[in-house]
Curated annotation (Swiss-Prot):
Keywords: Ribonucleoprotein, Ribosomal protein. This is Large ribosomal subunit protein bL28. InterPro entries: Ribosomal_bL28 (IPR026569), Ribosomal_bL28/bL31-like_sf (IPR034704), Ribosomal_bL28_bact-type (IPR001383), Ribosomal_bL28_sf (IPR037147). Pfam families: Ribosomal_L28. One of its GO terms (molecular function) is structural constituent of ribosome.
Length: 78
């Protein structure tokens, strides 16, 4: 399963660990992903999404129906 938020599209970023001596070693910054079930009243069913904490806040703001419409417009199957 890929580490990509289904709402925001956020994916792992790359950067450096920096020690006290400023040695640089490569590392990955992973998104704060959660698997969450949402009740969709219009479809009378649960929908499971893999999303970041920011994606959950977007759903709180816009509503699950609007977010699902955006995801389906991108061609993702839900």
């Amino acid at each position: 399963m890929s580490r990509v938020c289904q709402v925001t599209g956020k994916r792992p970023a790359v950067g450096n660990n920096r020690s006290h001596a400023l040695n640089a070693t490569r590392r990955r910054f992973l998104p704060n992903l959660h698997t969450h079930r949402f009740w969709v009243e219009s479809e009378n069913r649960f929908v499971t999404l893999r999303l970041t904490a920011k994606g959950m806040r977007i759903i709180d703001k816009k509503g699950i129906d609007a977010v699902l419409a955006d995801i389906r417009a991108r061609g993702e199957k839900i």
